[in-house]
A protein has these predicted regions:
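Active-site core segments that coordinate phosphate-bearing ligands/cofactors
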Residues: 1-162, 171-195, 203-230
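Catalytic-core signal marking the mid-to-C-terminal active-site face
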Residues: 200
Length: 231
């Protein structure tokens, strides 16, 4: 709820993807959505600020990316995020797709080996280097977003013209651009520190220091946003 508060008062009708260790994709509603399709889609209606409802799906997200990078670091490959992104960008697209929520990745002590085994067992091309594995991870995360996005669109019977991508993932330009491409939707990325900033906004509002009408101005003055349009 805190993270969503950083964007929920921007009057665009856009949907929100909170992109961190976990992903939370959804929209702000006036009340809970209680349809059979929402139930079958494993949606949650969570209280949001100002008596609104977050209608969302939760999923494992950047944990696999961070764990992959950490394990490579343990092996002596000290890639920065930018370096790993460059390797992923240079690798061929569409090598393979994994399910980043699968137990074999959540419990893996060797993400690279687990990706190779998954690809081999599913009859897909096996990555031969770090760049290919990195691309598979990012493309698979984006595919997960796309599936969630399309399910949300089916339930809402509408699609937004804008997706707010907030949280740590907003710092990854490759992930943001590929998300815009896959969803065929403009992505507004940032703030990266949405949870902390949103919490501060809510506390200040509770103390009467600001109103919800001030949230957008505070966020705009505190954080720059990047816009990604579909290629």
């Amino acid at each position: 709820a805190s993270a969503f508060a950083t964007v929920q008062y921007q009057d665009t009708g856009g949907w929100i993807l909170s992109c961190g260790t976990w992903s939370i994709l959804g929209s702000i509603e006036k009340g809970p959505v209680l349809t059979e399709q929402a139930f079958q889609g494993n949606y949650a209606n969570e209280p949001a600020y100002d008596d609104s409802t977050m209608f969302v799906q939760n999923s494992v997200n950047l944990w696999i990316w961070e764990e992959f990078r950490r394990q490579l670091e343990d092996q002596g490959f000290n890639y920065t995020h930018e370096e790993l992104n460059r390797l992923a960008d240079k690798a061929d697209a569409g090598i393979a797709v994994i399910d980043p929520t699968a137990p074999e990745f959540l419990l893996s002590k060797d993400i690279l080996d687990s990706i190779r085994k998954y690809c081999e067992e599913s009859g897909q091309q096996v990555p031969v280097n770090h760049g290919e594995a990195a691309r598979i991870i990012l493309e698979s995360l984006v595919e997960n977003y796309r599936q969630q996005f399309e399910t949300h669109a089916e339930i809402k019977k509408a699609t937004p013209s804008l997706l707010y991508l907030i949280g740590g993932g907003s710092r990854n330009p490759l992930l943001c651009q590929w998300t815009a491409n896959a969803l065929k939707t403009t992505v507004k990325a940032g703030p990266a520190n949405a949870t902390a900033l949103g919490s501060s906004l809510i506390q200040l509002a509770s103390l009467g220091e600001i109103g919800t009408g001030d949230f957008n101005d505070v966020v705009g003055a505190s954080c720059a946003a990047d816009i990604y349009t579909p290629d």
